[in-house]
UniProtKB/Swiss-Prot annotation:
The gene is sfsA. It comes from the Bacteria. InterPro entries: SfsA, SfsA_C, SfsA_N. One of its GO terms (molecular function) is DNA binding. HAMAP family: SfsA. It holds the Pfam family SfsA. It comes from Shewanella pealeana (strain ATCC 700345 / ANG-SQ1). Belongs to the SfsA family. This is Sugar fermentation stimulation protein homolog.
Amino acid sequence: MEFSPAFETGVLVQRYKRFLTDITLDNGEQVTIHCPNTGSMKNCLFPGEKVWFSTSDNPKRKYSRTWELAQTPEGHIIGINTGRANALAEEAIHAGVITELQGYHSLRREVKYGSENSRIDILLEDTKKPNCYIEVKSCTLLEEGQGYFPDAVTARGQKHLRELMEMVEQGQRAVLLFVVQHSGIKSVQAATHIDAEYAELLSKAYHKGVEIIAYSTDSSPLGASLVKSCPVRL
């Protein structure tokens, strides 16, 4: 995925009201930009560190700039825009990077499914095999060298696990794909200390046949892509 034009830089001041972030531009001006991340962003907020943002030419937007990347004090890069995770996953499937998800003749996004009125992030279909339902989650929480998901209690994430288990029970294939958007994360596991119910459901889903995989992202101001499999600790 290429970013055109390339992201511009600033320095983080603060994130507040969930969707707003103040940064200082390279010319010293302080501006408010959109934060496209609904999570707690635990361990992603480092005031005084470098950030990168994109700029939209849509005149209807109140905030034309969107926060895209953050740099940690250790020099790691974090993908802040969780909305890019699905596109990164789709691109990686088409490119053959995600080897577990090859051999299907069609790919669709945001398809309604399940008994809890959900939309699956990616649906792979083929006439010769069961459909493959893929739920994509962006993972950015790093604590003591370990990557965790979620970074806050997620009722929505719990619902998605129940829906995936339902698909397996119906004879379909179900996959939970963690898109790792923190360059310091080397493996992923459930954040039992943050959302014990999610962790319990994740273990249950795995034992019922839901496949759980993770892929690391290589991100820069010029572009991003999924590059390699990342271990999941269950």
